[in-house]
Each structure stands twice: as C-alpha cells, then as structure tokens.
C-alpha cells in the first residue's frame, strides 16, 4: 500500500483541459480498461506506447518488452475507431522466423478497435452515466477469409475483447472525479476475460492538466497518470501495472472540425 501511495505522490509532485486518458491499446479509456468516455467529434489522435511485457496478452508471443503505435478517429459524435500496430520480434527456434530475425523487431501485429457511445452522460436524465459498447481485435484467423468473433483460438486476435462500459463524473471541491465500470469478455485460451473492471480518475482542482488514474482491469491493479500539455494537443502517459511494471506513452491530438487552441 505504501508503494501505491508513494507513486501517487510522485505523480502529483512532477506536475506542480479537458483531457481523457488514452488506453494503452489505442482507444479512449483509463490505462488498460476501456470506459464510456468519448473524444470530441472530429478528433484525430496519433500515439505510441512503450509496453512492458507484463502489459502484453500472450507470453509466448511477447516474452519481451515491446512498443505499439496507433491512429484513433472519433466521428459522428458517438463512434471511435482505432488502428493499432504492436511490434514483434523474431523468435529463436521457431520455423516461422529465419535466424537473422531472432530477437529483432521485424514484424508487427495489427488490429482494429472500435467503441460506440450509446448514451452520453446526463442524456435523458441529469444523473445518467455515459454508456458505451465496443470491441478490440475481433478477428482471430492468421489466414483464410473468415472472422471468428469469439476469438477462442491462439492464432492472432491477441488483443481480443468485447466490452460494455459505464462512466460517471462528479465535480468535487478536490477536483473532477470519474468513476468507471466495464464488463470485459472474450474466449481466448491464453488471455481469458469474463469479469468486471473498475477504475477511478481524478483531475485535481489545483491543476486540471493532470489526470491521476487507478484501476482494476479484471487482471491486475494499475496506477498511473496522464499529463496534458500545449492545450491538450500532447498527452504524456505513465503507468505502473500491478504497482511495479512501467509502461509509458505519448499522443498528439487535433480536431479536424476546428476549435483547436494553439496558444
């Protein structure tokens, strides 16, 4: 517990908008878990992350730290789509990988993720939370032309998950508090999901460019922070998965519909 408290204090100490956390998988979310928040209509995000191997879903495929990069677009006010590439090294003693590729980043796993916001926060009822559904990496075939939406085999679909999420924000004297709950499901054998995830985030009143995050992602307890600079165009992400494994990311955000603040 002391370790978690010290880390939160460090995150605050480093940082003496309206930024949302950027999930390490490329969608708007917390750290690992998806939530029901949505970027503004017309927002485009380009980003990348350093991912500790414990942050990756398949230990046989990623037994090493890696990186990803992604493109994220929000349109029609309620739909968000991301395209994510995660770097892969050639593995020794696998026929698929020539010896000259061993332990080198020579390939990448590609997948799509999407989220639809069914209900906006405060819509229909002032206490209504936002509600969203979505999917990450819905296909699993390494060849052929079929799509297995259950992704119950080991081939590809490494990041597969379906989800339904709810988010509610509260304005407190301390700052803006977000409470998030998400049900996650897949049929993966190497990374099964069929559980609830919970998270909170706090944007302190004294410094709203800072976003402190804690979550249980249905597997581990993670803590981290997002820091927004240059009017929310750049966002820096820092995470401790399970309180000890470091991942970090950087995103650039711009809105194609205008209204960008460049000061």
Indicate residue ranges for each PLM-predicted region:
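Short, surface-exposed linear patches
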Residues: 67-71, 188, 202-204, 234-239, ...
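Outer-membrane beta-barrel "beta-signal"
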Residues: 111-116, 198, 242-263
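Detector for outer-membrane/organellar transmembrane beta-barrel domains
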Residues: 151-217
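Glycine-centered flexibility motif
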Residues: 25-29, 34, 42, 180-184, ...
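Cleavable N-terminal export/targeting peptides
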Residues: 1-27, 259-263
């Amino acid at each position: 517990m002391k370790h978690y408290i010290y880390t939160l204090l460090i995150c605050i100490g480093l940082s003496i908008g309206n930024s949302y956390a950027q999930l390490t998988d490329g969608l708007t979310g917390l750290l690992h878990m998806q939530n029901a928040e949505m970027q503004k209509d017309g927002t485009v995000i380009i980003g990348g992350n350093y991912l500790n191997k414990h942050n990756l879903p398949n230990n046989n495929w990623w037994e090493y730290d890696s990186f990803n990069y992604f493109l994220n677009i929000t349109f029609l006010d309620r739909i968000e789509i991301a395209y994510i590439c995660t770097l892969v090294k050639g593995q020794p003693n696998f026929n698929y990988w020539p010896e000259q590729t061993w332990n080198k980043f020579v390939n990448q796993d590609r997948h799509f993720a999407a989220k639809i916001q069914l209900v906006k926060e405060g819509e229909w009822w002032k206490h209504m939370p936002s509600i969203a559904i979505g999917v990450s990496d819905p296909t699993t075939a390494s060849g052929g032309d079929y799509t297995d939406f259950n992704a119950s085999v080991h081939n590809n679909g490494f990041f597969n998950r379906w989800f339904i999420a709810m988010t509610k924000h509260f304005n407190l004297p301390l700052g803006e508090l977000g409470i998030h709950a998400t049900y996650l499901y897949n049929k993966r054998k190497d990374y099964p999901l069929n559980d609830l995830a919970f998270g909170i985030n706090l944007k302190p009143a004294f410094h709203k460019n800072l976003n402190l995050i804690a979550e249980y992602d249905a597997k581990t307890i993670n803590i981290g922070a997002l820091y927004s600079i240059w009017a929310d165009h750049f966002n820096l992400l820092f995470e401790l998965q399970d309180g000890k494994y470091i991942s970090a990311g950087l995103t650039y955000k711009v809105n194609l519909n205008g209204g960008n603040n460049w000061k």
